[in-house]
Amino acid sequence: LRQSQFVGSR
C-alpha cells in the first residue's frame, strides 16, 4: 500500500 493511496484515502 503506497503512502499516496493512504493519503488519498483520508
Swiss-Prot record:
It comes from the Eukaryota. It is found in: Secreted. GO terms for biological process: neuropeptide signaling pathway. One of its GO terms (cellular component) is extracellular region. Keywords: Amidation, Neuropeptide, Secreted. The modification Arginine amide is found at R10. The keyword Heme does not apply. Contractile action on the inner circular body-wall muscle of the animal. This is Urechistachykinin-1. It comes from Urechis unicinctus.
